[in-house]
Structure formats: structure tokens, C-alpha cells
Amino acid sequence: MTSAEFSVEFPYVSKPIVPWPASASSNNSSSQNIDFPVLKPDQDPIAFFQTNNTAYLQPGATYYWKCIELSKPIHIYGQGATVQLVGPGPVFVFNSESVIPEDFYVVFENINFIEDEFPIRSGQLSLGLTTHSAVWFINVWKTSIVNCNFKNFRGAALWYSDNRNFWNARKWNQQHLVSNCRFNGCRIGISNTGSSEYSIASQNQFYDCQICFNVTGGNWSRNNNVIVNCRCAYLHVGDNMWYEGHSENNNPAKGTFCNNIINHADNGGNVWPTQFKLTDGSTIQLASFYFDDNQEIPPCYSGNFHWFGDVNIVNFSTTKIDKWCITGCNFYGNTHAANDAGQVQVAEAVKDKVFIIGCSGNNVTMKNIVEGNMTPKIGTIK
């Protein structure tokens, strides 16, 4: 083709365009419309869930639900709908009827869970408030909660409670997943019992919660979360924790707590009280990371960024682990008004076992830290 023959109107076409043949009609089921099961706010949710394994909520709608008990798998796609709890709950309780619930899949996606009243900050958690939750999973495995919002829950927004029976089957199949979710204004974000293990709670955001992770069960990956204006990011004590369940302090705590951002836990934003009452009536003074269990070991602790986020290591098992290291973290605190803000504190009983390696920081208080156990040296040792 010469330049004289080249079309100005169609400069990139050298040959006539071959038209596509007209689409032929087909009775193939893949081309037919599919009726998705949409649950409307005025329908009975329990009856709907009993007859459907998948449910779609109506976009923009608000559902006023409480105490929906199910013993079957379900996938619920919220499409941005709101589910509101009024009074005691929880909204959902899943309880498997099987000893080994290997195929009990539950999925929540893109739902806004909210309680009608904000927690009373000056008050304490009590037995009557523990049911003010969004979802309880009791002996249920393989659950996923993705792209959901949880707001104003006066108890734990999510509770995972598994039995010990799975040990005999050697299945290790809890496999819970919480990802890309937001928790705002909750007393507790996520709680798990002593037999709820091998799960992931990562890439979530927590704002204005008193406790983000109320940790009993071990072997969870709690990484890459953003935690702002919350008094405590991670709490584990050996006895009398809330939401222990029947398994209590069974095989707890150990796992990973890495690459989290923890800002304004004890200064500059948090408005929750530091004092926290346990189930026996005793109280502790929360820190952004608080660990006190002489029978167990803390999680792997690496890459966390603390901006006024204090740490308190009260006790851990020195027979199960000879040394425990905090590595690659950043610690910033210490203002003129609060010179111990953001401090890293280790109890006298375990101070020789704690090492701080490769961390950065300003002149934040390092209380009871052995200078020879820290490289490079950061902060002000007291």
C-alpha cells in the first residue's frame, strides 16, 4: 500500500474489517439469568438461612437482627448493607453439631455490623456485656470475614471458641481468617479461646477500641494491622481472661505479632481507661502490648512501629524459652508532659531473658531493660 492509498480516516486499517457473526441464541444454562437469593430486611432471616447456603443482602438496607443461631455453613454477601444489634446478642451464633466440623464453611463479606449504643468508657466489662457481639463461632472451622466493619460493640465484636476434641483427630483445621476489616469504638475487637488456633487476623484496622486482640488461643498470625487510639493492641494473661470458653488457657498465646502500626495507645489520642478488670474482679494496668503468663511464651515480636505505644512484659515461661527477643521495632514516646509515655517495661523476674535487637527509637523510657541485652542502645534506661 502506497501513502496515496492509505486512508486518513482509518490510519491503522490496512484491510477491510471482518465483521463478527451475529450471536446465535442458545438454550445453554450458562447464558441464562441466575436468580441470586436476596434476603430483604422484612424477611425472617433464620428461615431464609435454613433454606439457602448463600445469601445476598440488599445494598444500602439496614437489618435489625439478634441471636440468630445456625448450625450449618453459610455465605453471606452484604453488598454494603448494615446489620444492627439492639440490646444483648450476639447477632450471629454458629455452633457446629459435629465433633470434628471439617467442612463448616462460613463467609461474611462487605457487611457493616454496628451496635446501637457506644460502650461506656468509664465502665468495666461484665458478664452481661459479653453477649454484645457481632458473631460468635463455637466449634466451627474454616470461617472467613472479609471487608467488614464493626462499630460500637460493648463486648468482643468477634469471638472464636473451639473445643479440644480436634486434638484426637490431628486435623488442625480451625483455619479462621479475618482480613481487610475495620473495628471502631469496640470494647474488644477479636477474642479467641484456648483451642482456637492456626488462624489469621491480618491487614485490619482498629480505631478507638480498648483492646484489639484479647488473646487466649495461640498459633495465630496477627500481622500487618493498623492500630490507632486503642489502649491495648494485644492482651494475654495466664488466668481469668474474658472469653476463655471451655478450653480456658489451653496451648495459648504463641504465634506472631509482627509489622503492626500501634499509635497513641498511652498518649495523644486514646481515651479508654488503662485499668481493666478481669473475670475474678482483679484489675491490671493495660499497655499496648501486655503479657503476663509464667506458663507460656509470648509471640514472635518483630517489625512493629510504636508511636506512644507502651509495652509491659510482666512474666513468661523461662523453662519453655531461654531468651525472648524484640527485633526490628520502632519505639517513640517521652513528652515533657508524660516522660514515660510509650515506655518499654520488663518485670524484674524476666529482665535477663529479654533482648532488644535492631530497634530504633528516641529517648523513650526503657524500664528494667538490661543494657547488655540491647543492641544498638536506644532510649533512656531506668
UniProtKB/Swiss-Prot annotation:
InterPro entries cross-referenced by the UniProt entry: Adeno_E1B_55kDa (IPR002612), Pectin_lyase_fold/virulence (IPR011050)
One cellular component term from this protein's GO annotations in UniProt: virion component
Location in the cell: Virion
Entry keyword set: Virion
Stretch forming the signal peptide: none
Superkingdom field: Viruses
Summary of subunit composition and partner proteins: Homotrimer. Interacts with hexon protein; this interaction tethers the hexons together.
UniProt function note: Structural component of the virion that presumably stabilizes the groups of hexons but is dispensable for assembly.
Family that this chain belongs to: Belongs to the atadenoviridae LH3 protein family.
Protein name per UniProt: Hexon-interlacing protein LH3
